[in-house]
Regions:
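Strongly charged
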Residues: 82-114
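Ribosome large-subunit tunnel/peptidyl-transferase-proximal elements
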Residues: 1-79, 104-114
Length: 114
């Protein structure tokens, strides 16, 4: 069985999130959660929350099946770019410079199959 969780409109660039997300792809869920919990990155906290949501989705949506969270694997983990918020900042000589505030969408798929 597979289950998916998506975190949308995360206020961090996809490039920064991808750095942390690549380290948990393909791991067992327990190992991935342990690695994310002790990571100092801001993205690690968001990825950990999304991973826990994917595990909860699998357990709660398949109540008839006996699913053990210990044997689950992270099958897919990827990040896509979300909408970019464009803001302006005052610059010298009466000008304005543009600020880009990128957002991201994180998708994590967990499975109990090999």
């Amino acid at each position: 069985m597979e289950s998916k969780a998506i975190a949308r409109h995360i206020h961090q660039s996809p490039r920064k999130i991808r750095k942390t997300l690549n380290s948990v792809r393909g791991l067992k869920v327990g190992e991935a959660l342990n690695q994310l919990h002790f990571s100092p990155e801001k993205a690690a906290k968001i990825i950990e929350k999304t991973l826990r949501s994917a595990v909860a989705n699998l357990v709660n949506n398949n109540e008839k099946l006996d699913v053990n969270p210990e044997i689950l694997d992270v099958k897919e983990a990827f990040v896509d770019g979300g909408p970019v918020m464009k803001r302006f900042r005052a610059a010298s000589m009466g000008r304005a410079s543009q600020l880009r505030r990128p957002t991201s969408h994180i998708t994590i798929v967990v499975t109990d199959e090999k």
